[in-house]
Amino acid sequence: GNGSRSYSYLGSISENITRKQWNNYIRPIHGQNAWSFASLANGWIAGVSREVLQEAAFHGHICEGTLGGYSIVKALIKYYPPVQETLTGGGSPADVTSYKILGVPGGSDDDAVLFFLDATIGKTSYVGIDTTATGATENMLGFIRWDAKSLSGDLIIMSFDSKKIKADFKAETGINADAGSLEELKYCTWWIN
């Protein structure tokens, strides 16, 4: 058969392991899978929501973009919710508007928005636009809250400031989030909490 009783790694995976333990972990796992497993396990133990874990599995790992995209979607729904129809009889009102998403490809936040707003490519709600020449950053997303009946909508542009968030993390913890994988795990946990 294809199965094996031997394992590639047996031990702890979290932001709290030592650099030596980390090296023992990544040596047999290799590449992106090592970060994927570590970030998902660390996010789970940090108490990240089920929705973020599902999106991270879709995306491949938990990272600043995953958490930033989730934060953007939460803010979008809170401050610019879908407009709903008014019903005079019973039943649940339907959404009158839908979101059209204008992404700036390159950041993981795009995957998060695709997942959380169920806007996968086949649903034609997402368009990636190369806006590099305009000064838009990869952490920026545009949304059109579209009303198909009136053929009008509201343009909403949102982003997260990676430099500021990392500076806040460093000021609070003394840790440079970009110093290595263990530091990035600590940064993600800080963001989760």
Can you annotate each of these PLM segments?
Residues 1-62, 71-193:
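Non-transmembrane, aqueous-exposed alpha-helical and coiled segments at domain scale
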